[in-house]
């Protein structure tokens, strides 16, 4: 009897424990399903074949140099076909180790260098696959005033927004310059920010491994304890995730904040208010986000200051008709300097390749700056560039006999052609001679491939 009672007691306890386990298990499963329904298993979505293939196509379209393994984009495709399953298996097991990035230094206009980190093609593809699935999560969360590295937004939209605020009376700006922003992102802060919205911890850990992958410089791998190197497909999104905290903070304070990547402008209606903003924004960036504000370059300034207000290469002006966007003086100087280089006498051994290079550069420049009001400036540069091309052609003709024959062929009377062809005047002077201008007129040069800046500007600017 005692034995039966003891057995019955054990059985009752076992049943009770089993029922408790079943209830707890069901509760856990319900919570897990609710969690999964809120955000699907993100890592599986990232590594889904269609997403991965789309990522490779994007990397291929962007071209780019090899990473430390020397593998080109063309060589990566057969490698991926053969090893994709192996790579994904390692990622699922948490065993995938990204390669260090290859350090590349690009000269900056101010004389410094911009450090890029070039990942391998395989890692670029993986980063792109991650980015494609994170963008839909983060886009609704980003501030309206954020314009860099975002779909259907551009630098032109950013400067137009500044113009809009200026028209509302926000005529003082705080221009913030962050020192080595991409290289100094705090990993701990960034990972914690990611965890707020990325619920699949495996994805967070994969991103963390990319952040910690290191950089190879002069054959030596250096650990990366901070930063997200420019050059990776994931870095632009991570940069926006990081500074979105700043955007949202000043949005709460009712401060107009326009940001393009790490180029930040805060706007105020008085100089005193802008000075307070400079102090509070610097404090937030340095204390909360652990970034370094370049105090020499960060400043308060009127948005109409001819030299001092510069945002994304643009400036603002105003006249009797109101506020308008213009090209900053430094941007003009850089544009003319590059055109001078492309049309130099040394480069004009063959005129057609030079004209093509000028066309490619000038067209890209106008597509970017075409929003600005600059008709008179463009007309001036256009006339100057025509003059330089005539000078190049005159130099290319070299011998007096060749110059004479070509001038006559182009309709210049023989006696006049002979005088000009045998002149000892310098190239720049002769190329501005009336007969040379007539012989090498705009129509003929355009037919030869000259890119007329004035005509191109009119067609671009009419859209604004």
Task: Indicate where each model-derived feature is located.
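Core structural elements
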Residues: 47-52, 100-102, 109, 349-369
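A conserved non-catalytic segment of reverse transcriptases
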Residues: 212, 288-356, 361-363
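Conserved polymerase palm-domain catalytic core
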Residues: 90-105, 109, 141-303, 308
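Short, solvent-exposed helix-loop connector elements
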Residues: 223-226, 324, 340-353, 365-377, ...
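Phosphate/adenylate-binding "loop-and-lid" substructures adjacent to NTP/NAD/dNTP-binding pockets
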Residues: 66, 70-110
């Amino acid at each position: 009897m005692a034995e039966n009672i003891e057995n019955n007691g054990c059985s009752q306890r076992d049943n009770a424990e089993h029922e408790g386990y079943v209830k707890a298990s069901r509760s856990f499963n319900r919570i897990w399903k609710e969690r999964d329904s809120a955000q699907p298993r993100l890592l599986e979505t990232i590594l889904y074949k269609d997403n991965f293939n789309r990522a490779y196509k994007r990397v291929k379209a962007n071209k780019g140099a090899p990473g430390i393994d020397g593998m080109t984009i063309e060589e990566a495709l057969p490698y991926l076909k053969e090893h994709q399953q192996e790579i994904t298996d390692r990622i699922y097991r948490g065993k995938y180790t990204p390669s260090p990035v290859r350090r590349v230094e690009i000269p900056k206009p101010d004389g410094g260098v911009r450090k890029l980190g070039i990942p391998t093609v395989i890692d670029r593809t993986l980063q792109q696959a991650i980015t494609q699935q994170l963008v839909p999560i983060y886009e609704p969360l980003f501030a309206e005033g954020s314009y860099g590295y975002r779909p259907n937004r551009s630098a032109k939209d950013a400067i137009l927004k500044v113009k809009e605020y200026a028209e509302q009376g926000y005529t003082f700006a705080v221009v913030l310059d962050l020192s080595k922003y991409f290289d100094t992102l705090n990993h701990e802060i960034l990972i914690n920010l990611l965890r707020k919205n990325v619920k699949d911890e495996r994805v967070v850990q994969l991103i963390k491994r990319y952040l910690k992958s290191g950089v190879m410089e002069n054959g030596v791998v250096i650990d990366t304890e901070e930063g997200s190197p420019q050059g990776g497909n994931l870095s632009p999104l991570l940069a926006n995730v990081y500074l979105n905290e700043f955007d949202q903070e000043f949005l709460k304070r009712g401060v107009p904040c326009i940001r393009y990547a790490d180029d930040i402008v805060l706007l105020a209606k008085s100089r005193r208010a802008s000075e307070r903003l400079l102090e509070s924004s610097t404090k937030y960036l340095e204390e909360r986000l652990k970034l370094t504000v370049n105090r020499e370059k960060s400043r308060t300034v009127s948005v109409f200051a001819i030299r001092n207000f510069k945002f994304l290469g643009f400036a603002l002006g105003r006249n009797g008709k109101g506020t308008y966007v213009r090209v900053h003086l430094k941007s003009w100087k850089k544009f003319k300097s590059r055109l001078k280089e492309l049309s130099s006498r040394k480069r004009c051994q063959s005129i057609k390749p030079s004209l093509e290079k000028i066309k490619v550069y000038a067209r890209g420049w106008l597509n970017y700056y075409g929003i600005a009001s600059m008709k008179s400036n463009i007309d001036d540069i256009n006339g100057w560039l025509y003059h330089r091309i005539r000078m190049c052609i005159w130099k290319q003709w070299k011998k007096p006999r060749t110059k004479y024959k070509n001038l006559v062929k182009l309709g210049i009377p023989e006696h006049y052609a002979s005088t000009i062809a045998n002149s000892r005047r310098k190239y720049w002077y002769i190329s501005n001679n009336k007969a040379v201008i007539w012989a090498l007129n705009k129509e003929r040069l355009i037919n030869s491939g000259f890119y007329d800046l004035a005509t191109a500007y009119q067609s671009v600017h009419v859209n604004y």
